Curated annotation (Swiss-Prot):
KW DNA-binding (keyword) present: yes
Intrachain S-S bonds: none
Name of the protein this chain belongs to: Protamine-3
Biased composition (Acidic residues): 45-70
Native source species: Rattus norvegicus
Keywords noted in UniProt: Chromosome, Developmental protein, Differentiation, DNA condensation, DNA-binding, Nucleosome core, Nucleus, Phosphoprotein, Spermatogenesis
């Protein structure tokens, strides 16, 4: 991924000579895009798990009024999930299949 970013930057080299401010802005934007893409990849892998758990807690707070019975059940699932309840994790955290991939 990093090499692709570098290629884009070098491709914009000559453009910098013709229009300094324009070329510079363009190359900067490309670099920022590359960096954010790189960061995004890392984020989706590392932070996804944390976000997942936070999401569950938020949901629990929301559902407290509607279905209080689900809270202890979800709490138990949360504790078991990361260790061995892969199936339960999938059922509880459907929107984020990322952590499951890390397990495999």
């Amino acid at each position: 991924m990093g090499s692709r970013c570098a290629k884009l930057s070098t491709g914009h080299g000559p453009a910098q000579n013709t229009g300094h401010s324009r070329g510079h802005e363009s190359s900067m934007k490309k670099l920022v895009a590359c960096v954010s893409q790189d960061n995004f990849s890392l984020s989706s892998e590392g932070e996804e798990e944390e976000e997942d758990e936070e999401d569950e807690e938020e949901e629990d707070d929301d559902e407290e009024d509607e279905e209080e019975e689900q809270i202890p059940v979800k709490g138990k699932l949360l504790l078991l999930e990361p260790e061995k309840q892969d199936g339960a994790e999938d059922a509880v955290a459907q929107p984020s299949p990322e952590p499951k991939q890390k397990h495999s």
